[in-house]
């Protein structure tokens, strides 16, 4: 085992929330990128494997000892090329692709499930239209690192297309991130920042809501609820100037 690191920032909350929940994948984060045009899918698949290897946080493993949770980077873990699915022969390739993604997210993807905590798939739905599906456990990535990994993989793919060398990893080793977090947590700046945000919280108004009824007591889920509304042209013309004034 390499250096053991404590959970930091949002990680302890994510770990505890998953332990308290019986949902199989509520703490997985996923999206897909639509790619239009000619694509060298085997080359992109190789770029995915190399780009994921450059981010050591994606090789993180977790263990709990005497009630304390530790994380460590598995030096032996290597990422293979993601699977490529061709759905052009399906009656509705778009919905078939979405079904593939939903099937992946319906698995038990908890941190202790033994399933891969990072997964990519390239899905072809037309001759020049692809979906690049990406899914991670939230312990591994946050809202910044998720798209940063995507951008690095895309940079590797573009470099290889022009026979340029593989771009170096832009990612800070996670051990350095933990060290910086711990230094900040022990600094006077952390005390000042905490006092500032505590005051901001005390001054916040009640949460805004479009409903007079309280929130229902249902448990959270990984399901997605969508509601689409069409605004009349006249109402939209009235709203547009107001939106521009507050942009």
Give the ranges of each region predicted by the language model.
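Acyl-group handoff/entry surfaces in thioester-processing enzymes
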Residues: 2-75, 91-184, 205-209, 237-239
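Short, charged/polar, Gly/Pro-enriched secondary-structure boundary elements
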Residues: 76-83
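Short, histidine-centered active-site or binding-site loop motifs used for metal coordination
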Residues: 86-88, 136, 233
């Amino acid at each position: 085992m390499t250096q053991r690191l404590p959970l930091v920032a949002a990680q302890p909350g994510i770990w505890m929330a998953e332990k308290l929940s019986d949902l199989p994948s509520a703490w997985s984060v996923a999206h897909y990128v639509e790619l239009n045009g000619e694509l060298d899918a085997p080359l992109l698949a190789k770029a995915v494997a190399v780009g994921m290897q450059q981010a050591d946080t994606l090789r993180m493993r977790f263990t709990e000892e005497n009630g304390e949770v530790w994380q460590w980077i598995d030096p032996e873990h290597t990422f293979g090329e993601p699977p490529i699915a061709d759905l052009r022969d399906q009656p509705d390739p778009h919905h078939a692709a979405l079904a593939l993604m939903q099937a992946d997210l319906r698995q038990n993807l908890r941190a202790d499930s033994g399933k891969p905590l990072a997964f990519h798939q390239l899905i072809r739905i037309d001759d020049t239209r692809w979906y690049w599906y990406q899914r991670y456990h939230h312990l591994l990535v946050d809202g910044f690192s998720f798209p940063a990994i995507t951008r690095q993989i895309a940079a590797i793919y573009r470099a290889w297309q022009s026979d340029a060398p593989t771009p170096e990893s832009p990612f800070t080793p996670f051990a350095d991130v933990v060290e910086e977090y711990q230094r900040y947590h022990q600094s006077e700046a952390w005390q000042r920042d905490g006092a500032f945000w505590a005051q901001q919280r005390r001054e916040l108004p009640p949460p805004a809501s479009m409903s007079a009824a309280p929130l229902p007591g249902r448990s959270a889920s990984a399901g997605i609820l969508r509601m689409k509304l069409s605004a009349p042209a006249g109402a939209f013309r009235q709203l547009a100037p107001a939106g521009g004034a507050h942009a």
